[in-house]
């Protein structure tokens, strides 16, 4: 019997493959994206220390009332918020880690909003 692997299992395999190549340093930390069925999360991570430097999501008090669901509008708001917080901490250059997701839709919208708000990647 052939069992088709779930989409999430395939995404995790892709993410592991990408993580072998994408590494965040103190000079250029990693901007990681995760999306659940209801929310979108973004973190800027220094992989040498294993610390999260900045984070933003649709669960943040600033976005909770404005951003409803994991859609493009919410992704745009999360991208702008993570860029604003990163620039406040002096982080301008990052490495984008799409988390195994296709660079399309919500992930692309978040990345474009972060770029427009001042992050370089």
Swiss-Prot record:
InterPro entries for the chain: Ribosomal_uL18_bac-type (IPR004389), Ribosomal_uL18_bac/euk (IPR005484)
Biological function: This is one of the proteins that bind and probably mediate the attachment of the 5S RNA into the large ribosomal subunit, where it forms part of the central protuberance.
Family: Belongs to the universal ribosomal protein uL18 family.
Disulfide bonds: none
GO BP: translation
Cellular component terms (Gene Ontology): cytosolic large ribosomal subunit
Example of a GO MF term: structural constituent of ribosome
Record text on subunit structure and interactions: Part of the 50S ribosomal subunit; part of the 5S rRNA/L5/L18/L25 subcomplex. Contacts the 5S and 23S rRNAs.
Name of the protein in its database record: Large ribosomal subunit protein uL18
Alphabetically ordered keywords of this record: Ribonucleoprotein, Ribosomal protein, RNA-binding, rRNA-binding
């Amino acid at each position: 019997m052939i069992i088709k692997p779930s989409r999430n299992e395939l995404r995790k395999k892709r993410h592991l493959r990408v993580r072998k190549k994408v590494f965040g340093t103190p000079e250029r930390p990693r901007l990681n994206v995760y999306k659940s069925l209801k929310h979108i999360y973004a973190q800027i991570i220094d992989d040498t220390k294993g610390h999260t430097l900045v984070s933003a999501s649709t669960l943040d008090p600033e976005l909770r009332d404005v951003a409803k669901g994991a859609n493009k509008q919410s992704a745009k708001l999360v991208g702008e918020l993570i860029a604003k917080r990163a620039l406040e901490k002096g982080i301008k250059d990052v490495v984008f880690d799409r988390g195994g997701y296709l660079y399309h839709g919500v992930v692309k919208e978040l990345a474009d909003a972060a770029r427009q708000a001042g992050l370089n990647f």
